[in-house]
């Protein structure tokens, strides 16, 4: 995984996501999930392209089950975009890079 992608856990979620001074895109995933693996290159590309403007992270739902339950994650992949500590966009299923970029750009205006 790219060094630009932050590993998010139940333990660091508040600091990395809710208290971040820039928007944060969190990919809720699991290793056994085929569609989640399809998103890996897209997530890594977005992390590089938006470095310094948006924090991009991944949270493994198998190893961290408190945070997904707080945000009503019932299917993966789910991507949630957070801004100022609030979930502002929730997308379930595999999304195109174009769709994810549009969601990010809307929050950067």
List each language-model region with its residue ranges.
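Structural alpha/beta surface segment adjacent to cysteine/selenocysteine redox centers
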Residues: 67-76, 80-88, 94
């Amino acid at each position: 995984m790219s060094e630009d992608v932050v590993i998010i856990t139940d333990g660091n979620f508040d600091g990395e996501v809710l208290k971040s001074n820039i928007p944060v895109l969190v990919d809720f995933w699991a290793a056994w999930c085929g569609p989640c693996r399809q998103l890996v290159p897209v997530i890594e590309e977005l992390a590089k392209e938006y470095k310094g403007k948006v924090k991009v992270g991944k949270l493994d739902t198998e190893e961290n089950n408190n945070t997904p339950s707080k945000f009503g994650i019932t299917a993966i992949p789910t991507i949630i975009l957070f801004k100022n500590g609030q979930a502002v966009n929730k997308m379930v299923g595999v999304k195109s890079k174009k769709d994810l970029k549009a969601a990010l750009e809307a929050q950067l205006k």
